[in-house]
Amino acid sequence: PLYKQNMKEEIAELKAPLGIYMVPGNHEYYGGISESAKFICGTQIHLLRDTVVTLKGGLQIIGRDDYINKRRKSLKELMSTCDRNKPTILLDHQPHHLSETQAEGINLQFSGHTHHGQVWPVSWITDKIFEQSHGYKKWGKSNIYVSSGLSLFGPPFRIGTQSDMAVFNITY
C-alpha cells in the first residue's frame, strides 16, 4: 500500500489536468483499508470505491472497489447511474469478468493486479487465470488495458517480466 511506502512526495509531483483517480486493490485491504484510505485522502488522489464521477466534457470514470470486497457493487448497478451516450472509463484493480465490461458498453477499462506473474514461469499461470493478464486487447467495443505495474509482491525483483507504467492521452 502507498501509505506503507510513504509515497506522499512522489504523489505530490503527479500532474493531471482533470485529476488523479485510484481504486483500492487487494493489498490496500491486506495492509488495512482504513489506513490506506486515510493516507490516500490526504493526497491529491481521488479514491474511488464503487463510485462514478463525471468530468468536464462528460467523461465518466467508474471506480470499483476491489474484488476482495464481496459487498462491492455490481458493474450493472454502477452503470445504471451513467449516461450511456457519454464515454466511460472503468478502473477495476483485478481484471475479472471482462465479458461484463463488454456487456455494459464500457469504452475503456484499466486494471492491474497480475504483475504479469512477476517471475517467469508464473506469467504462464497468470495468462491462464485471467482473460487478459497484461497489455492491451480490444474486446468487442471495449478496450482493456492491464498493467504489469511498477510495484512488486513478495521478493523485490522480476525475472522474465517487465514493470510497466502506461501513459494514455485520452481525447473525447
Regions inferred by a protein language model and the residue ranges of each:
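Soluble catalytic domains of enzymes that build or remodel membrane lipids, polysaccharides, and related
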Residues: 1-172
